[in-house]
Amino acid sequence: MAQKQIKVTLVRSVIGTKQSHRDTVRGLGLRGLNSSRVLIDTPEVRGMLRKVDYLVTVSEA
């Protein structure tokens, strides 16, 4: 069975955010504003998304 995937898009700038939140965004593979990545839906990724939920949008890939 194929693993579930999610699409993550950075919709707010990381300027003025905590360094740990900036590091989390980079860890998700997001660089500039409106950049997107398709990631495998794992508990680790979900935890990272929960930490920066005010900066990103999540949709099914």
From Swiss-Prot:
**Molecular function, one GO term:** structural constituent of ribosome
Protein's GO biological process: translation
Q: Does the keyword Ribosomal protein apply?
A: yes
This protein's record includes keyword Ribonucleoprotein: yes
CDD domains (alphabetical): Ribosomal_L30 (cd01658)
Keywords in UniProt for this one? Answer: Ribonucleoprotein, Ribosomal protein
* Domain of life assignment: Bacteria
Q: Name one Pfam family in it.
A: Ribosomal_L30
This entry carries the following GO cellular component terms, namely: cytosolic large ribosomal subunit
Q: How does it assemble?
A: Part of the 50S ribosomal subunit.
What family classification does the UniProt entry report for this protein? Belongs to the universal ribosomal protein uL30 family.
Which NCBIfam families does the UniProt entry name for this protein?
Answer: rpmD_bact
- The protein depicted here goes by the name Large ribosomal subunit protein uL30
